[in-house]
């Protein structure tokens, strides 16, 4: 099998520009062995190893049923439309390939029909999008909403015309036989290789999320790319949550049922209005948006208790009213089941004294989520692996801390796995420079953003933009963008002003832009060549100590006799930093400077752990040296 990766192998012969790499060959060997012996394997493969081909080739050669799961939909689409067909063609693979996304990624024909019938109540632009979608529904074969270019991805129409596990009518749906989810699932059941994402994999394994039985078909090989995201995503699925969005969707379905099928039951409209209003009132009690807080502490507040009681009563009323009309409308019957489910969830969320969970809430400008999350998913994930014997393969560029994979395997309860650490083949000694500038402002001192922007401006201008400024908070992101826009003539792009895809397009086409962003640009973004040669990180990405989930994990670690900083905070921050750093050098010809604006990297003992986990680039504290490197990378 390793011959596929030799200079004369199948891949080199069939793929233009394919260059064999030793780490890639080693990884392919390990994957083939793990599949052959049906055992778990954990591989950290540094950027540029070519890990995608390294797991695809042996997986296709094995002639078994394979599931490949990614952390992001972007990588999922790239795998299915680019990498998988390329390797399959090179190896003359004859098996069937399928792409499967979560239910809410497909147009729901029944909900589209309901919205068109109740259309008079929609805002003009939303109604216009619904009309466009009716015509698109007749043209699309898959119903995958990411392929619809005529309606913007942030249109309010999308949540109205896609279904969730909560509101899908399942086999009771009048349009069941034309359902895009059913078709996608059938294709996946019949396929030999299915590309999914972690959310869908876990939803199906844990929640059995579908009215159709198991979505993820029986497989012999499970491969997780971007596996560093798995522990956090798994904790969502092993917990419970209830959001105002779910409650308002429920209220909307009550309204549609009343206006289309049950016009004689006016109570439906009344209880829908009351539910929507009480959800809105509860959100207003929560105060400022963008904050994640402790639900146990929140529920001690008398005003919150009162608002929650009214929300509880409104949900109870919906349940009672829907119960009286059961059997008269498939839509209302499904809504009744959701009302029952949400009553149960709200009751569980109010039982805040159960140990082993973090109880938290967060709110955006219009919505809120109440949630409980288990402090550890190791035992649960171990059960999931035991239920599905076969090869479990986990890979990412960022799994280790200080060359040790223990933090990752322990969080998921992975035992007796083979492990492999493959360094990046890039020559960081020549291709990159790490700069931790002198005289940095303290992170929380007044005017920190102004001071930092003034310090970084000469470097960004000397590089003619072509820079990512990655921030650890939204506040710092906005403050820095404001400072840069006031003092520079280069285009300054800001995350949130348009979609992620459009921002990246603007960044690449401008050729001299500065992109100021936060967490969503720390990973899964691939900009090669001269377009990006400077990455600046505002500070070490420790999660806020006020984050209730982090607090609870630290407390749990303390109770078990561990050191919360060394075992929880530090490893999480190291892995996040490695992701951000990975944006800079994406190819053997790339050159660039990485700037980390945090003295702790060189002044605190734990800085050594961060540095040991970063690529081995030369280091400096002199901004002028960094500017010289950018002007003439080969002279260093």
Each predicted region: which residue ranges?
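A substrate-engagement module of RecA-like helicase motors
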Residues: 1-14, 47, 64-192, 199, ...
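Conserved pre-motif I regulatory segment
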Residues: 1-43, 57
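Walker A/P-loop NTP-binding motif
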Residues: 32-33, 52-65, 82-86
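Signature of the SF2 helicase/ATPase Hel1-core->accessory helical subdomain module
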Residues: 61, 77, 82-85, 165-166, ...
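Conserved RecA-like ASCE P-loop NTPase motor core of nucleic-acid helicases/translocases
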Residues: 66-72, 394-395, 465-472, 595-597
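A contiguous, basic/glycine-rich beta-loop/short-helix subdomain that forms a polymer-engagement track
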Residues: 159-194, 205-212, 317-440, 447-454, ...
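Conserved helicase motor "Helicase C" RecA-like lobe of SF1/SF2 P-loop NTPases
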Residues: 472-496
């Amino acid at each position: 099998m390793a011959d596929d990766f030799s200079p004369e192998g199948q891949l080199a012969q069939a793929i233009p520009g394919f260059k064999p790499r030793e780490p890639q060959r080693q990884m392919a060997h390990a994957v083939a062995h793990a599949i052959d012996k049906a055992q778990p394997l954990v591989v950290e493969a540094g950027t540029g190893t070519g890990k995608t081909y390294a797991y695809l080739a042996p997986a296709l050669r094995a002639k078994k049923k394979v599931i490949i799961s990614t952390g992001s939909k972007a990588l999922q689409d790239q795998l299915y439309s680019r990498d998988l067909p390329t390797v399959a063609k090179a190896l003359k693979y004859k098996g069937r390939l399928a792409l499967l996304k979560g239910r809410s990624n497909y147009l729901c024909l029944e909900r589209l029909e309901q919205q068109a019938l109740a259309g008079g109540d929609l805002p003009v632009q939303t109604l216009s999008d619904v009309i466009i979608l009716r015509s698109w529904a007749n043209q699309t074969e898959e119903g995958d909403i990411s392929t619809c270019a005529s309606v913007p991805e942030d249109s309010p129409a999308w949540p109205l015309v896609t279904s969730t596990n909560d509101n899908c009518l399942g086999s009771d749906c009048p349009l069941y036989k034309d359902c895009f989810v059913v078709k996608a699932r059938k294709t996946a059941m019949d396929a030999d290789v299915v590309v999914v994402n972690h959310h869908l994999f876990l939803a199906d394994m844990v929640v059995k999320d579908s009215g159709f039985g198991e979505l993820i078909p029986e497989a012999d090989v499970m491969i997780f790319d971007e596996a560093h995201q798995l522990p956090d995503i798994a904790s969502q699925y092993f917990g419970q949550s209830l959001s105002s969005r779910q409650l308002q969707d429920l209220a909307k379905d009550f309204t549609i049922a009343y206006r289309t099928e049950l016009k004689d039951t006016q109570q439906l409209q009344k209880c829908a209005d009351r539910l929507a209003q009480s959800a809105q009132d509860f959100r207003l009690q929560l105060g400022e948006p963008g904050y994640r807080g402790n639900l146990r502490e929140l529920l001690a507040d008398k005003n919150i208790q009162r608002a929650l009681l009214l929300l509880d009563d409104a949900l109870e009323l919906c349940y009672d009213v829907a119960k009286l009309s059961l059997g008269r409308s498939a839509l209302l019957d499904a809504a009744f089941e959701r009302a029952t489910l949400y009553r149960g969830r709200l009751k569980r969320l109010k039982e805040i004294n159960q140990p082993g969970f973090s109880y938290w809430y967060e709110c955006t400008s219009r919505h809120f989520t109440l949630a409980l999350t288990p402090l550890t998913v190791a035992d649960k994930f171990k059960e999931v692996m035991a239920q599905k014997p076969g090869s479990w393969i986990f890979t990412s560029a960022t799994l280790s801390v200080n060359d040790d994979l223990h933090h990752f395997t322990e969080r998921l309860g992975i035992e007796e796995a083979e492990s492999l650490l493959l360094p990046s083949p890039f020559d960081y000694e020549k291709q990159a420079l790490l700069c931790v500038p002198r005289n940095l402002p303290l992170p929380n001192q007044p005017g920190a953003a102004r001071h930092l922007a003034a310090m970084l401006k000469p470097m960004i201008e000397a590089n003619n933009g072509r820079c990512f400024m990655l921030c650890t908070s939204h506040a710092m992101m906005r403050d820095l963008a404001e400072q840069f826009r006031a003092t520079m003539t280069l285009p300054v792009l800001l995350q949130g002003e348009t979609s992620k895809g459009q921002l990246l397009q603007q960044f690449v086409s401008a050729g001299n832009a500065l992109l100021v962003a936060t967490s969503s640009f720390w990973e899964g973004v691939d900009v090669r060549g001269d377009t990006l040669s400077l990455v600046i990180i505002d500070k070490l990405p420790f999660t806020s100590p006020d984050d209730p989930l982090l607090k609870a994990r630290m407390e749990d670690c303390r109770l078990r006799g561990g050191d919360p900083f060394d075992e929880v905070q530090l490893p999480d921050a190291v892995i996040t930093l490695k992701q951000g750093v990975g944006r800079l050098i994406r190819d053997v010809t790339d050159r660039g400077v990485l700037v980390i604006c945090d003295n702790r990297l060189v002044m605190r003992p734990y800085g050594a752990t961060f540095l040991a986990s970063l690529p081995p680039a030369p280091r400096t504290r002199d901004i002028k040296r960094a500017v010289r490197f950018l002007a003439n990378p080969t002279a260093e």
